[in-house]
Amino acid sequence: MARNPVSPDSSPNPAAAPASPPADPRKQVVEALMRLAASRRWDEIELSDIATEAGVPLAQLRGLFPSKLAMLGGLTRIVGDAVLAGSSDDLAAEPVRERLFDLVMRRLDALAPYKAGLRKIAPVIRRDPLTIAALNRGAVNSWRYMLASAGIATEDALGGLRVQGAVLLMARVSEVWLEDDEPEMSRTMARLDRELKTAGKIMSRVEDVHRLTAPLRGLARAICNGRRPQVRRRERSDESLRREGEDFAPAI
Protein backbone atom coordinates (compact mmCIF):
# COMPACT_ATOMS: atom_id res chain seq x y z
CA MET A 1 0.00 0.00 0.00
CA ALA A 2 1.44 3.31 -1.08
CA ARG A 3 2.08 5.86 1.67
CA ASN A 4 0.57 9.29 1.34
CA PRO A 5 3.16 11.97 0.55
CA VAL A 6 4.15 14.14 3.46
CA SER A 7 3.04 17.73 3.11
CA PRO A 8 5.90 20.26 3.20
CA ASP A 9 3.99 22.23 5.84
CA SER A 10 3.83 19.23 8.16
CA SER A 11 7.54 18.44 8.09
CA PRO A 12 9.48 19.43 11.20
CA ASN A 13 11.43 22.64 10.94
CA PRO A 14 14.76 22.40 12.77
CA ALA A 15 15.14 26.17 12.71
CA ALA A 16 11.88 26.57 14.63
CA ALA A 17 13.24 24.68 17.65
CA PRO A 18 14.69 27.04 20.27
CA ALA A 19 18.45 26.79 20.26
CA SER A 20 20.05 26.32 23.66
CA PRO A 21 22.63 28.99 24.47
CA PRO A 22 26.20 27.81 23.94
CA ALA A 23 28.06 26.82 27.07
CA ASP A 24 30.55 29.38 28.34
CA PRO A 25 33.94 27.63 28.17
CA ARG A 26 35.42 29.92 30.83
CA LYS A 27 32.68 28.98 33.25
CA GLN A 28 33.15 25.30 32.36
CA VAL A 29 36.83 25.54 33.26
CA VAL A 30 36.20 27.37 36.54
CA GLU A 31 33.57 24.84 37.60
CA ALA A 32 35.90 21.98 36.64
CA LEU A 33 38.65 23.45 38.81
CA MET A 34 36.30 23.83 41.76
CA ARG A 35 35.09 20.23 41.44
CA LEU A 36 38.67 19.00 41.46
CA ALA A 37 39.57 21.31 44.36
CA ALA A 38 36.80 19.77 46.46
CA SER A 39 38.46 16.35 46.31
CA ARG A 40 42.18 17.01 45.78
CA ARG A 41 44.96 19.06 47.25
CA TRP A 42 45.54 22.33 45.42
CA ASP A 43 49.12 21.47 44.46
CA GLU A 44 48.03 18.10 43.07
CA ILE A 45 45.69 19.61 40.47
CA GLU A 46 47.49 19.80 37.13
CA LEU A 47 46.41 21.89 34.17
CA SER A 48 45.88 18.72 32.16
CA ASP A 49 43.50 17.47 34.87
CA ILE A 50 41.46 20.66 34.59
CA ALA A 51 41.32 20.43 30.80
CA THR A 52 40.11 16.82 30.99
CA GLU A 53 37.51 17.62 33.65
CA ALA A 54 36.24 20.61 31.67
CA GLY A 55 36.22 18.70 28.39
CA VAL A 56 38.41 21.19 26.54
CA PRO A 57 41.76 20.73 24.80
CA LEU A 58 44.81 21.91 26.70
CA ALA A 59 45.54 24.44 23.95
CA GLN A 60 42.08 25.97 24.40
CA LEU A 61 42.53 26.02 28.17
CA ARG A 62 45.71 28.04 27.70
CA GLY A 63 43.79 30.59 25.65
CA LEU A 64 41.12 30.88 28.33
CA PHE A 65 43.27 31.06 31.46
CA PRO A 66 47.07 31.19 31.82
CA SER A 67 47.09 29.66 35.31
CA LYS A 68 45.01 28.23 38.14
CA LEU A 69 45.23 31.60 39.87
CA ALA A 70 43.63 33.22 36.82
CA MET A 71 40.83 30.65 37.07
CA LEU A 72 40.16 31.79 40.63
CA GLY A 73 39.97 35.30 39.24
CA GLY A 74 37.44 33.94 36.76
CA LEU A 75 35.36 32.68 39.67
CA THR A 76 35.36 36.19 41.13
CA ARG A 77 33.98 37.48 37.84
CA ILE A 78 31.30 34.78 37.61
CA VAL A 79 30.12 35.57 41.13
CA GLY A 80 30.19 39.30 40.48
CA ASP A 81 28.10 38.88 37.33
CA ALA A 82 25.56 36.81 39.25
CA VAL A 83 25.19 39.50 41.92
CA LEU A 84 24.92 42.29 39.35
CA ALA A 85 22.21 40.35 37.54
CA GLY A 86 20.07 40.75 40.67
CA SER A 87 18.36 43.98 41.59
CA SER A 88 18.94 46.20 44.60
CA ASP A 89 16.28 48.75 43.65
CA ASP A 90 14.08 47.78 46.60
CA LEU A 91 16.94 48.76 48.95
CA ALA A 92 17.72 52.10 47.32
CA ALA A 93 16.19 54.04 50.22
CA GLU A 94 17.76 51.84 52.91
CA PRO A 95 20.85 52.84 54.94
CA VAL A 96 24.25 51.91 53.54
CA ARG A 97 24.62 49.20 56.17
CA GLU A 98 21.48 47.40 54.95
CA ARG A 99 22.60 47.63 51.35
CA LEU A 100 26.00 46.17 52.22
CA PHE A 101 24.35 43.37 54.19
CA ASP A 102 22.27 42.49 51.12
CA LEU A 103 25.31 42.56 48.81
CA VAL A 104 27.37 40.25 51.01
CA MET A 105 24.54 37.75 51.46
CA ARG A 106 23.82 37.67 47.72
CA ARG A 107 27.51 37.17 47.02
CA LEU A 108 27.63 34.28 49.46
CA ASP A 109 24.59 32.77 47.75
CA ALA A 110 26.43 32.97 44.42
CA LEU A 111 29.50 31.32 46.00
CA ALA A 112 27.49 28.50 47.59
CA PRO A 113 27.86 26.02 44.67
CA TYR A 114 31.65 26.31 44.99
CA LYS A 115 31.85 26.14 48.78
CA ALA A 116 33.38 22.66 49.01
CA GLY A 117 36.25 23.63 46.73
CA LEU A 118 36.78 27.01 48.38
CA ARG A 119 36.97 25.35 51.78
CA LYS A 120 39.98 23.34 50.60
CA ILE A 121 41.61 26.21 48.70
CA ALA A 122 41.30 28.94 51.36
CA PRO A 123 44.02 27.66 53.75
CA VAL A 124 46.48 27.43 50.85
CA ILE A 125 45.75 30.99 49.74
CA ARG A 126 46.15 32.39 53.26
CA ARG A 127 49.73 31.10 53.38
CA ASP A 128 50.74 32.85 50.14
CA PRO A 129 50.94 36.67 50.32
CA LEU A 130 51.55 37.00 46.57
CA THR A 131 48.40 35.03 45.78
CA ILE A 132 46.43 37.14 48.25
CA ALA A 133 47.68 40.33 46.59
CA ALA A 134 46.80 39.06 43.11
CA LEU A 135 43.30 37.96 44.12
CA ASN A 136 42.77 41.23 45.96
CA ARG A 137 43.10 43.17 42.70
CA GLY A 138 40.32 41.14 41.12
CA ALA A 139 38.17 41.44 44.23
CA VAL A 140 38.61 45.22 44.28
CA ASN A 141 37.46 45.48 40.66
CA SER A 142 34.47 43.25 41.41
CA TRP A 143 33.42 45.11 44.54
CA ARG A 144 33.69 48.46 42.81
CA TYR A 145 30.74 47.39 40.68
CA MET A 146 28.98 45.74 43.62
CA LEU A 147 28.96 49.01 45.55
CA ALA A 148 27.97 50.99 42.47
CA SER A 149 24.98 48.68 41.96
CA ALA A 150 23.84 49.53 45.49
CA GLY A 151 24.21 53.27 44.98
CA ILE A 152 27.35 53.55 47.13
CA ALA A 153 29.93 56.05 45.86
CA THR A 154 33.19 54.57 44.59
CA GLU A 155 34.75 57.39 42.56
CA ASP A 156 35.01 60.21 45.10
CA ALA A 157 37.99 60.92 47.35
CA LEU A 158 37.07 58.07 49.72
CA GLY A 159 35.80 55.66 47.06
CA GLY A 160 38.95 53.55 46.99
CA LEU A 161 38.84 53.15 50.76
CA ARG A 162 35.20 52.04 50.64
CA VAL A 163 35.95 49.44 47.97
CA GLN A 164 38.98 48.00 49.77
CA GLY A 165 37.05 48.00 53.03
CA ALA A 166 34.27 45.99 51.41
CA VAL A 167 36.83 43.46 50.15
CA LEU A 168 38.29 43.04 53.64
CA LEU A 169 34.83 42.78 55.18
CA MET A 170 33.89 40.04 52.70
CA ALA A 171 37.10 38.15 53.44
CA ARG A 172 36.49 38.18 57.20
CA VAL A 173 32.89 37.07 56.82
CA SER A 174 33.90 34.33 54.37
CA GLU A 175 36.19 32.79 57.00
CA VAL A 176 33.14 32.01 59.12
CA TRP A 177 30.89 31.16 56.18
CA LEU A 178 33.24 28.43 54.95
CA GLU A 179 32.81 26.60 58.27
CA ASP A 180 29.12 27.41 58.74
CA ASP A 181 26.95 24.56 57.46
CA GLU A 182 23.73 25.63 59.15
CA PRO A 183 20.90 26.36 56.70
CA GLU A 184 20.11 29.61 58.55
CA MET A 185 23.79 30.68 58.48
CA SER A 186 23.33 32.25 61.91
CA ARG A 187 27.07 32.34 62.65
CA THR A 188 27.79 33.97 59.31
CA MET A 189 25.13 36.63 59.73
CA ALA A 190 26.29 37.35 63.28
CA ARG A 191 29.85 37.87 62.03
CA LEU A 192 28.58 40.04 59.18
CA ASP A 193 26.60 42.19 61.60
CA ARG A 194 29.68 42.74 63.80
CA GLU A 195 31.90 43.54 60.83
CA LEU A 196 29.38 46.04 59.47
CA LYS A 197 29.25 47.82 62.83
CA THR A 198 33.04 48.02 62.95
CA ALA A 199 33.27 49.19 59.34
CA GLY A 200 30.60 51.83 59.97
CA LYS A 201 32.53 53.27 62.91
CA ILE A 202 35.79 53.36 60.96
CA MET A 203 34.24 55.04 57.92
CA SER A 204 32.47 57.57 60.13
CA ARG A 205 35.80 58.61 61.67
CA VAL A 206 37.52 58.71 58.28
CA GLU A 207 34.77 60.90 56.84
CA ASP A 208 35.01 63.23 59.86
CA VAL A 209 38.77 63.58 59.40
CA HIS A 210 38.33 64.13 55.67
CA ARG A 211 35.73 66.83 56.30
CA LEU A 212 37.75 68.58 59.02
CA THR A 213 40.91 68.64 56.92
CA ALA A 214 39.12 70.03 53.84
CA PRO A 215 40.21 73.66 54.62
CA LEU A 216 43.84 72.54 54.96
CA ARG A 217 43.70 70.68 51.66
CA GLY A 218 42.15 73.73 50.03
CA LEU A 219 44.90 75.95 51.43
CA ALA A 220 47.58 73.56 50.19
CA ARG A 221 46.07 73.55 46.71
CA ALA A 222 45.87 77.34 46.72
CA ILE A 223 49.53 77.63 47.73
CA CYS A 224 50.65 75.12 45.10
CA ASN A 225 48.54 76.73 42.39
CA GLY A 226 49.63 80.21 43.44
CA ARG A 227 53.32 79.54 42.86
CA ARG A 228 52.97 78.87 39.18
CA PRO A 229 51.43 82.25 38.19
CA GLN A 230 54.13 84.05 40.18
CA VAL A 231 56.82 82.18 38.26
CA ARG A 232 55.11 82.93 34.96
CA ARG A 233 54.75 86.64 35.86
CA ARG A 234 58.43 86.81 36.79
CA GLU A 235 59.40 85.12 33.52
CA ARG A 236 57.26 87.57 31.53
CA SER A 237 58.84 90.51 33.39
CA ASP A 238 62.36 89.27 32.61
CA GLU A 239 61.41 88.81 28.97
CA SER A 240 60.07 92.40 28.79
CA LEU A 241 63.32 93.78 30.15
CA ARG A 242 65.27 91.88 27.52
CA ARG A 243 63.02 93.10 24.76
CA GLU A 244 63.53 96.78 25.70
CA GLY A 245 67.14 96.61 24.52
CA GLU A 246 66.37 94.79 21.26
CA ASP A 247 65.38 96.21 17.87
CA PHE A 248 62.72 93.90 16.42
CA ALA A 249 62.11 93.93 12.66
CA PRO A 250 58.47 94.24 11.59
CA ALA A 251 56.71 90.99 10.83
CA ILE A 252 56.96 89.97 7.19
Which residues does each predicted region cover?
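Hydrophobic alpha-helical connector segments
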Residues: G74, S88-P123, R127, R137-G138
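Inter-helical turn/loop segments and adjacent helix faces that build the functional surface
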Residues: I152-A157, V176-S186
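Basic, helix-initiating cap at the start of DNA-binding domains
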Residues: A2-L36, R40, S48-D49
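Amphipathic alpha-helical packing segments from all-alpha helical-bundle domains
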Residues: P129-I152, G160-S174, A190, T198-G200
